[in-house]
């Protein structure tokens, strides 16, 4: 058993008509992982588990395998992403109740220029292929400044 700070991210494809399109969101706490991984990334950085989570061994963050778009087939804004986090905490997704949106810094750790995956439109995104194809191309984050929320993109431009 390893005790680790887990960060569960929901790659949530989001869309705000007034602002921008986004596609991911996440969550944090300290829990124990009891199971063995069912799959490991080619560089051994990520481990996938049967409960629908992916562990980043470098950052000790745990992410949800599927994003909001993949699970709900719907667009969400930042407020809806936060409401969804509450719902999955209430349901104790994967046995955890401390999910949250990632910070900009945390979400940025998923972007790796040498990694390849495809988003819901079949376009190239730069996250590990252990994450299922068809996800969104960016993520909502917990970071805010006045009335603005920050997004991290996984497309060519990468980052914030």
Residue ranges of model-derived segments:
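Glycine-aromatic-enriched surface loops/turns that form tight recognition elements
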Residues: 2-7, 15, 19-100, 104-160
């Amino acid at each position: 058993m390893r005790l680790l700070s887990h960060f569960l991210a929901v790659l949530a494809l989001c869309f705000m008509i007034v602002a921008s399109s986004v596609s991911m969101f996440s969550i944090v706490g300290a829990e124990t992982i009891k199971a063995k991984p069912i799959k490991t990334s080619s560089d051994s950085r990520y481990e996938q588990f049967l409960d629908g989570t992916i562990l980043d061994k470098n950052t000790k963050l745990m992410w949800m395998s599927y994003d909001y778009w993949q699970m709900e087939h719907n667009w969400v804004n930042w407020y809806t992403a936060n409401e969804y986090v509450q719902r999955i905490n209430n349901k104790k997704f994967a046995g955890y109740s401390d999910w949250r949106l990632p910070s900009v810094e945390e979400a940025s750790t998923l972007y790796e220029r040498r990694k390849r995956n495809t988003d819901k439109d079949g376009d190239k995104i730069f996250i590990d292929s252990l994450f299922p194809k068809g996800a969104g191309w960016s993520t909502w984050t917990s970071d805010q400044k006045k009335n603005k929320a920050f997004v991290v993109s996984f497309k060519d431009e990468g980052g914030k």
